[in-house]
Amino acid sequence: VGVYAMQIAMTEAFKMKLTVEEADAIFGRPMGIPKTGVFGLYDLIGIDLMADVLKSFIKELPKTDKFHEVAQEIPLIKKLIETGYTGRKGKGGFFRINKDGGAKILEALNLETGDYSPSKKIDIKSEKVDLKKLINRDDKYGKYAWSVISKIIKYASSLVTEITDEFNDIDEAMRLGFNWSKGPFEMLEEIGVENFFSKIDNYDGNKFLENLAKSKNENFYGERQKYTKIETLGKVKRKAQSIDGNSSAQIYQFKDYNIVEFTTKANALDYDSMDALKKATDKPLIIIN
């Protein structure tokens, strides 16, 4: 779901001719997503590593999975990888730091020309606006937000019963795994069930959405689960025993589980990071950075 969300945010930005700054400004804090957005997150993870992730999903997911619709190779991304622009760990990516002349200037990639120019700060005046207002805006930002959010909700809901029987498990995975402040179904509840269904064209055979539309239940989520305070991983790590590691990650053992801590610049993932994860999977695993 998380990778699908990244891909739909990227492909829609290309389709709607948004700049990378505009896309990240919308697919970011206004939607309860970290400020790296989509293009900044691609740079952080590594554009080449994301290409490998997509190839893996294309190979493993059934042909009927709608992920395939957003996983096609983009020529500009292929060119970036071939020329060493793999993100923060490389010469740059969708963003880069230009040090010519002594000053450090943040530059952004033009998705149409492939050229760099000084990055522009985008103020869409939606930092404190709720999702319902954001998707109802009658401008390119509102149209982009709605297109991305609606497709994420459709995709996530199509996986209910296939990957989990409880839809809130998907929300929790997105909060914990991608650091979103709200998952797809929490977004749906914030948008409003009636408002959502008034804006979509069809259910695409989605049983979850069909049943929800029939129920007309605006508060389908119910009461949220409350969590008790737990010990931080930073404190746990200080008590753990270092058992292995490499230039990109360190492996610790604590009680009956392993901990992997990434140590690369900006926590960028590379092949040594993946090797450390592979070595640590003989026990229950916690990943920190």
Where are the regions that the model predicts?
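N-terminal glycine-rich phosphate-binding loop for ADP-containing cofactors
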Residues: 1-288
